[in-house]
């Protein structure tokens, strides 16, 4: 329960595993999942509970090493300008190597993003002109829909289809037709897929990336859900399926879904292609809005400690 976390404020270093049994009362603790209904005038009927199916927010406490890392930093009473630490980059590289089998990842390939959606738009602004068509699979995460449409991009949907076993699959024939007909040169690929929950198999990603290569389509791969995989499945990073995919793809990650850190804000991109990386970095910096929070940095480092792997 919450009293266990209070021990951290008393100077006692407590190493605990992720707690999936404690029930948190989040009322009055800055949680829209507990206190907000996004439908004007809607109220919870008497005898019913509020179930926030509309937002990806867990009621589990985060891994204790996150709290510990932030508490240690908070005790130093200055929070001025800073640069990302070596430990920040090392934590991400180690996480990607151990969790996803990534090789060759270096600090210069990693860049901070205030959020995955903001990173998606920065990348699209480099890959496209406003008004361009962008390929997405449907059903489509509403965040993509709102972000792309608000920024002047037209979404072309390629619907997923169920195979004979009831598994949602990409329709490669439809994708090719849509790419050609709509002169598409950028696609947003959600892996694992939100909302269907598909963890794509390697051959599926390879086939999609072959299509994108054939028609010179840049790819933004949102892999924010890649840590939450059920047994019997394995996340395959889009950039890992071929050398062309490695250079054609901007990948987006964050600890926010995995460790319930959305309120801290802090995502990151991985871009191997120097031409793409330099332009995305420039685009995301133009407004001076895409700046890291020092506590967010320490939260990521805490999340990516050994306890986080468990």
Summary of predicted features, one role per range:
Residues 17-115, 122, 304-306:
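N-terminal small-domain helix-loop-helix segment of the aminotransferase-like
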Residues 75, 79-210, 227-228, 235-240, ...:
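Conserved core of the PLP fold type I
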Residues 153, 214-217, 246-247:
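A short helix->loop->beta-strand "cap" motif at the edges of active sites that frequently abuts
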Residues 65, 69, 91, 174, ...:
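Alpha-helical elements of Rossmann-like donor-binding domains used by nucleotide-donor carbohydrate transfer enzymes
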Residues 223:
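Walker B catalytic acidic pair
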Residues 1-15:
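Short, Lys/Arg-enriched N-terminal segments with co-localized hydrophobic residues
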Residues 248-310:
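PLP-dependent aminotransferase class I/II
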Residues 188, 219-220:
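Walker B beta-strand of ABC/ABC-like P-loop ATPase nucleotide-binding domains
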